[in-house]
């Protein structure tokens, strides 16, 4: 199953594409803490799973980071990985690319809407309100 299909099945299973709602349905605790340069991370232990978000993130940014961390929980349930922000957000590691692709496919599931409003990756980035690198990942599934 490819990442877009996995994101679509996740939306169908939970009846929403909101990562906060999905976390709630899964019993994943969401915490907001001051994290310095770190935007978020997820972890699991004997008490359950949690997504920790930087308390200073704007709402839209928090949704993207939450979707990213949810991707780690769903795609890589046995790993405790930390999502570190870098100035260019260039993630060449396979796991990070997978969860980034999952996040943008979850948050922006409608190919037709994106195609109607965007003809370039730059337009897609602006329309979705995400960094260019995330828009590039989403564009792979719609041919922009």
Whereabouts are the PLM-identified features?
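Active-site hotspot residues in diverse enzymes, especially metal/ion-binding acidic/histidine motifs
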Residues: 1-144
């Amino acid at each position: 199953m490819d990442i877009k299909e996995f994101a679509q099945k996740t939306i169908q299973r939970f009846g929403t594409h909101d990562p906060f709602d999905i976390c709630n349905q899964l019993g994943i605790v969401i915490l907001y803490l001051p994290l310095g340069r770190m935007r978020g991370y997820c972890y699991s232990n004997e008490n359950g799973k949690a997504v920790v978000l930087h308390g200073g993130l704007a709402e839209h940014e928090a949704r993207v980071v939450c979707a990213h961390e949810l991707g780690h929980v769903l795609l890589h349930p046995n790993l405790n990985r930390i999502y570190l922000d870098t100035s260019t957000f260039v993630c060449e590691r396979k796991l990070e690319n997978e969860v980034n692709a999952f996040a943008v496919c979850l948050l922006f599931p409608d190919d037709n809407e994106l195609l109607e409003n965007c003809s370039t990756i730059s337009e897609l980035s602006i329309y979705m309100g995400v960094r260019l690198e995330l828009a590039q990942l989403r564009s792979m599934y719609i041919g922009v």
